[in-house]
A protein has these predicted regions:
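Structured helix-beta-strand junction loops
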Residues: 35, 180-181
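Nucleotide-state-sensitive switch-loop elements of NTP-binding domains
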Residues: 2-167, 171-172
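Short glycine-rich or small-residue beta-strand-to-loop segments that form or flank ligand, phosphate
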Residues: 100, 184-185
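Membrane-proximal helix-turn-helix segments that form the acceptor-binding/catalytic region
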Residues: 172-180
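Well-ordered beta-strand positions
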Residues: 135, 182-183
Length: 185
């Protein structure tokens, strides 16, 4: 794969479930000022509810000039990571978008998503050849942050986990999401 002269800038939105990522994404899309934007929405469930909210949330994505990619039934930080690599590479090499927004699922850790951009495959190709990770945004539910931060609950006890072996606590995930962000909303 060749290195593109103009790399596709990418913003990744993370934050726990219900923090407002999809609301923020819709706000950004409604105020994009003629930029051609591609969007990847990741949801753990089989039915990508967040993608549906974006598609029908008044963002008016142009079907001919813009693209909404749904990545469902897994997490882009682990089980769908290879799919993320392929989708970002495809969108970047199409060379028709000004920006890429990625909304990760609420239980996703930002570090593995970001490291996807530095990963080099066996042929020496990397997403960093065609795309530039511009901003890592974490959306925080400020009304519940203190309560969640002092919680000892495991994600799986809340019905939210990456699988049976997921031993993360809610506070571990919140710390990962907040510490890795360069923008917190």
């Amino acid at each position: 794969m060749k290195v593109l002269e103009k790399k596709l800038p990418v913003t990744v939105l993370s934050g726990f479930l219900g923090a407002g990522k999809t609301t923020l994404l819709n706000h950004i899309l409604n105020n994009r000022e003629n930029l051609k934007v591609a969007v990847i929405v990741n949801d753990m469930s089989e039915v990508n509810i967040d993608a549906n909210l974006v598609e029908h949330g008044g963002s008016n994505l142009s079907q001919t000039e813009e693209k909404l990619v749904e990545m469902s039934n897994g997490c882009i930080c682990c089980t769908l990571r290879e799919d993320l690599l392929m989708q970002v590479r495809e969108l970047a090499t199409e060379d028709k978008f000004d920006y890429l927004l990625i909304e990760s699922t609420g239980i996703s850790e930002p570090l593995p998503v970001a490291s996807t951009f530095d990963f080099r495959d066996e042929d020496g190709n990397s997403l960093s050849d065609v795309a530039q990770l511009d901003t890592m945004v974490t959306v925080v539910d400020s009304a519940n942050l203190i309560r969640n931060y002092s919680s000892t609950d495991f994600l799986k006890d809340k019905g939210e986990s990456l699988g049976e072996d997921d031993e993360r606590t809610l506070v571990d995930l919140l710390v990962d999401q907040i510490e890795f962000a360069n923008v917190i909303l």
